[in-house]
């Protein structure tokens, strides 16, 4: 719906299609393929910035668990939204479909979201440096999120980057596919905490 609305009057994309059905089908296909398929029937470089941003959001959310897709995963985002909704309404538990979600699951969802966001922002920053201002910033962001979510979509700027830029993109693909927590923890040594410290309240917000 969002892609159709933004591209409806764009003559280079949906605006140049002959009938309404073609526009709806092309917009729906482009939205669905952001999950992991990597196909496109519209030239992405002709799309408006708002459409590309919407596609970035879809790619960042990614596919569902146990699938071949990357990204943060749909269940992670769902748990975050439900937890935030409950917090705003003063609920102590996170409840979904009359079932209480374990606090450990909620904590893991927040951790996954935080690490994924930090990874993508870090890769985005480094690739902006490697890009050297050759391309639009939203194009660079699109490439980063597409790589992290292992979608396969692109705006054709990757060949212009140096070896360091391509290496960053490759590592981002691995992190997104394996799972960023698993990828990061594979390089770290976990240890059991033998000391439990006293709690402290910190002002938030």
Predicted region positions:
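Membrane-proximal intracellular helices of multi-pass ion channels
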Residues: 4-205
């Amino acid at each position: 719906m969002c892609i159709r609305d933004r591209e409806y009057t764009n003559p280079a994309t949906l605006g140049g299609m002959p009938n309404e059905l073609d526009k709806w089908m092309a917009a729906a296909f482009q939205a669905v393929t952001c999950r992991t398929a990597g196909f496109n029937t519209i030239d992405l470089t002709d799309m408006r910035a708002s459409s590309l941003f919407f596609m970035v959001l879809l790619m960042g959310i990614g596919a569902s668990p146990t699938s071949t897709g990357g990204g943060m995963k749909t269940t992670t985002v769902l748990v975050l939204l439900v937890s935030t909704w409950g917090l705003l309404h003063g609920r102590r538990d996170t409840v979904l479909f009359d079932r209480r979600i374990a606090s450990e699951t909620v904590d893991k969802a927040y951790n996954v979201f935080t690490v994924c966001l930090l990874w993508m922002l870090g890769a985005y920053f480094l690739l902006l440096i490697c890009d050297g201002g050759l391309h639009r910033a939203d194009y660079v962001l699109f490439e980063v999120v597409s790589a992290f979510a292992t979608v396969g979509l692109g705006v054709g700027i990757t060949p212009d980057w140096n070896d360091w830029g391509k290496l960053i993109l490759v590592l981002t693909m691995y992190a997104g596919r394996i799972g960023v927590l698993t990828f990061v923890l594979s390089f770290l040594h976990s240890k059991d905490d033998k000391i439990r410290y006293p709690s402290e309240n910190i002002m938030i917000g």
